[in-house]
Amino acid sequence: MSDLGAYIHAVETASSASALREAVIQLAQQNSTAAIPTLIAVLGYNNPAAAQAAVEGLIALGDAVVEPLLAQLDGYNYGARAYGVRVLGSIGHPAALQVLLAAAQSDFAPSVRRAATKALGTLRWQLIPEETVREAQLKEALAVLQRNSKAADWAVRYAVGVALDYLHQQAAARGIREAVRSLLNHLSDRDPDIVVRSRCQLALQRDSLSMHT
């Protein structure tokens, strides 16, 4: 058994929640793309601490994770799906866009909708080289954020504010900047929840500071 195989075996045979978490941490620390399938599998285990360790390990591996994770997103386990969407959002590769748009709009699990909504702002939009394609996809994302700004769940609306803040800071998203600012202004004034209003006000303050530096 190879060294990496031993780490994978330790994950697969862990006899307690704490042992599993430690085994996942050790596997993630190997920083090997060969560990990706095992780390993805851990997202579906009923062990939040181990899943969080797997999330961190997958994020550290970067773009190599995107294709296998998209192929293996769990349609039945919403907890695993939420972790997976968080990974995709943190990595930020636009190959995940269509999955994120669908999840943000229609996933039945609030945790998945929140994670996908935030991820629309953290995508690395500059990786879409064709400007007309990028602008069209940015408008798709903005339409979903506008829709989710009316969600009953305050946490989804909060995620909209976070996504708008990230989008507003991206040079690649300058084509929708005025629309982003307009939606931030609307939410900062009219959202019924003070936490959402405050988050949007923070984004606008950041914008104001950047304009004067």
UniProtKB/Swiss-Prot annotation:
Domain of life the protein comes from: Bacteria
EC number in record: 4.-.-.-
Enzyme class: lyase
Protein name as annotated: Phycocyanobilin lyase subunit beta
Subunit note: CpcE and CpcF associate to form a lyase.
Primary role: Required for the chromophorylation of the CpcA gene product.
One Pfam family recorded for the sequence: HEAT_PBS
Family of the protein in this entry: Belongs to the CpcE/RpcE/PecE family.
Plastid listed as a keyword: no
Keyword annotations: Antenna complex, Lyase, Phycobilisome
CC annotations in GO: phycobilisome
One MF term in the entry's GO annotations: deoxyhypusine monooxygenase activity
Matching InterPro entries: ARM-like, ARM-type_fold, PBS_lyase_HEAT
